[in-house]
Swiss-Prot record:
Keywords carried by this UniProt record: Acyltransferase, Cytoplasm, Transferase
Family stated for the protein in its record: Belongs to the L/F-transferase family.
Main location (coarse class): cytoplasm
Alphabetical list of SUPFAM superfamilies matching this protein: Acyl-CoA N-acyltransferases (Nat)
Record GO terms (molecular function): leucyl-tRNA--protein transferase activity
Taxonomic lineage from the root: Bacteria, Pseudomonadati, Pseudomonadota, Gammaproteobacteria, Alteromonadales
Protein name from the UniProt record: Leucyl/phenylalanyl-tRNA--protein transferase
Length: 237
């Protein structure tokens, strides 16, 4: 029987994702905190936090799950041509805090953000410990787009992206895919499907299949140099 779990501030194991509610889709647990060990345990088990500033902490594992396969992200011919013309520079882990702040800005027709100060502090700590990473897109010295997420073995768990110029977030996605392919990653978790992700080639897979893939990949080693601060040259041929 599916039922909602309530977490206290003592560290405890998450319930199985299979126990998540159908309505709302994927809600698994309420409460707890955003300590690094709890966040890492969540992602390690296919669970992520998502809540508004006036909500308690909510933990989710939706079914279906939106994913990308590195190498199958759709970069259209017109987008390739557009990106080739731009004098943009793309980097890894140069400005994690600024990327999170950009992602936290309310979108058009939205009054608030789920990327609260509490969330930003928690993920900055994960960045400092080498678990959370960012891709930045620059025009000169101005940050015009980017994304951030967590690396769990050979899985990259995407959290959010933003742009201040047209297609800058898509440039970040293209750079992420290129980098992950080179570093041997097998899966990008995009969490919940939406039209934008679908246009980029995201697929919805059953939660049980996602968890199976995650268990196969989460302990696989990756090159320690994968997330050193560096510049990425987009290969768009």
């Amino acid at each position: 029987m599916k039922s909602l779990s309530f977490l206290n501030h003592e560290f405890e194991a998450f319930p199985s994702p299979e126990l998540a509610l159908n309505d709302p889709n994927g809600l698994l647990a309420i409460g707890g905190d955003l300590r690094p060990e709890r966040l890492l345990s969540a992602y390690y088990n296919g669970i992520f936090p998502w809540f508004n500033s006036d909500d308690p902490i909510l933990w989710w594992s939706p079914d279906p799950r939106a994913v990308f396969i590195p190498g199958e992200v759709h970069i259209s011919t017109s987008l390739r041509k557009y990106l080739k013309k731009q004098p943009w520079r793309i980097t890894i882990n140069h400005a994690f805090t600024d990327v999170m702040a950009g992602c936290a800005q309310p979108r058009e027709k939205q009054s608030g953000t789920w990327i609260t100060q509490e969330i930003q502090m928690a993920y900055r700590e994960l960045h400092h410990t080498g678990h959370a990473h960012s891709i930045e897109v620059w025009e000169g010295e101005r940050l015009i787009g980017g994304l951030y997420g967590l690396a769990i073995g050979q899985v990259f768990c995407g959290e959010s992206m933003f742009h201040r110029k047209t297609n800058a977030s898509k440039a970040a996605v293209a750079a992420l895919q290129q980098h992950l392919l080179k570093m041997g990653f097998k899966l990008i978790d995009a969490q919940v499907m939406n039209p934008h992700l679908e246009s980029l080639g995201a697929k919805g897979i059953k939660r049980i299949d996602f968890i199976t893939l995650l268990r196969e990949l989460r302990n696989n080693p990756v090159d320690p140099a994968t997330w050193t601060t560096k510049e990425v040259i987009l290969e768009l041929e």
